[in-house]
Amino acid sequence: MIRVTVAGAAGRMGREVCRAALEDPEVVLAGGVVEPGSPEVGADLGELCGAGRAGVAASEEPPPEAGVLVEFTTPEATVEHLSYGLPAVIGTTGLSEEQRAKVEEAARGVPIVLAPNMSVGVNLLLGVVRRLSEALGPGYDIEIVEAHHRGKRDAPSGTALLMGRAAASGRGRRLEEVAVYGREGVSPRGEGEIGIHALRGGAVVGEHRVIFYGLGEEVEVVHRALSRRTFAEGALRAARFAAAAQPGLYSMQDVLSSSP
């Protein structure tokens, strides 16, 4: 049994995590943090997420026995919440290098799982992308296309960047050396480039495609999230890991490799 507190409890992902926690017999939803002054302060978390009354109220701060903080907020809020000193699962995307450094510093004192995508399927596919990139070699051009709902703020997605890094590492390169974000103008494709493209529209939960273009064939790896529930369940899996881990910064790869 673990205790979790959800930061960003009134948001899309926060509500989904609250609901998943309330439906999981091995998880206690200890609390939910919402923005100071929000109309959701004091709201019942179960009613907020559509699961029925839970007897746990949303608040501006974590409760005394918060357990693991599950964080799906903004980069600014995520950094601010590090001051709680709680074990954490961070699914917030769009962190700057400076903000990530602050997360790394906080992880010296508490276990933190930092994962732009909590989906088990996506994280298993990263290894597939790396192996394909290595095995197919430089004769295959790599393009990554991701699509999300119109409200997503950061582009490209953190998951697209993870896939780009996996593809680049399969060829012994760093993504920063070979990435091209979108295309325009008049010029041929550069040798070894990895193109990354972002689409935004409608209510798309999340789609990622990695395409290896050869001269005589194409190989495509696709992941489609059909609902946010997959991310919520992955976050709770990461929370179980964080509850038992030593201080340090971890990824979903660490979570999956430790799970039976």
Curated annotation (Swiss-Prot):
Do you know which InterPro entries this protein is assigned to? DapB_C (IPR022663), DapB_N (IPR000846), DapB_N_CS (IPR022664), DHDPR_bac (IPR023940), NAD(P)-bd_dom_sf (IPR036291)
Q: Which PROSITE patterns does the record cross-reference, listed alphabetically?
A: DAPB (PS01298)
**Annotated catalysed reactions:** (S)-2,3,4,5-tetrahydrodipicolinate + NAD(+) + H2O = (2S,4S)-4-hydroxy-2,3,4,5-tetrahydrodipicolinate + NADH + H(+); (S)-2,3,4,5-tetrahydrodipicolinate + NADP(+) + H2O = (2S,4S)-4-hydroxy-2,3,4,5-tetrahydrodipicolinate + NADPH + H(+)
List the active site: 148 (proton donor/acceptor), 152 (proton donor)
GO molecular function annotation: 4-hydroxy-tetrahydrodipicolinate reductase; NAD binding; NADP binding; oxidoreductase activity, acting on CH or CH2 groups, NAD or NADP as acceptor
Q: Which family does it belong to?
A: Belongs to the DapB family.
Q: What is this protein called?
A: 4-hydroxy-tetrahydrodipicolinate reductase
